[in-house]
Amino acid sequence: FKNMKLSNKYIAFASVALLMASCDLDKFPEGDYISEEQKEDIINGRPNLITAEVNAMAAKLNTFGTISDDATTYHNDYGIPAVSMILESGGQDLVALVNGYNWFNTSQNYSDRVYDSSSDELIWKTFYNHLKAANNVLKLIAADTEDSSLKVYRGQALAARAYDYLNLVQIYQFTYAGHENAPAVPIVLETTEPDVLSNNPRASVKEVYDLIEKDLVQAHSDLSSYQRLNSTYIDQTVISGLLARMYLLKE
């Protein structure tokens, strides 16, 4: 019985010690958490580790669940391919029956041309989520880096962001000529502070196109010596195509 009382005292003491330790919230997280500063230090020491952030950009292009949740599932919620179908269905050369499981029928009859349509939500969130992934990469790499691997990653992120804005500016405003000062879409950069995001008005068409051109020209320079493994990676040929498309749209 005496030994049991002693054991209970040890258990009580250990419980109090654990409780006190769990209440100490003033210490910096160690072990289980990695701060942004720690991540940046790691990447600067081992540039190859940033590939996870770069791969996230590609993953955002065809992800499921951008607008779906536990209450509602949209079967046309599968990223850029779905966005392409929405845009094609709004044209005159794609014919499909407006019944059954045609998830793009609202685009065919133009009833999705309202701000609260699921198609509009999918387009907006798909491009801005992909854009955020690109900004995450740019946030970790200094603009003046001389590291060859980091320059490639930065160039690919700049090209990805330009791709997003090139699509957004066409969808949410008329073409460039004659509409240079018309409101287009909000510009979000890697340097944009969180408190600005909730009060970030639409930039003009000219401002968006200027950013697209700036990003693509810099990306073209960053990828000057890059040889991609296959067509899933962004290289100078991709950027040249985007530049040509942008200049054509400005005419």
Regions found by a protein language model. Give the residues of each.
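Conserved, well-structured interaction surfaces
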Residues: 96-172, 203, 220-226
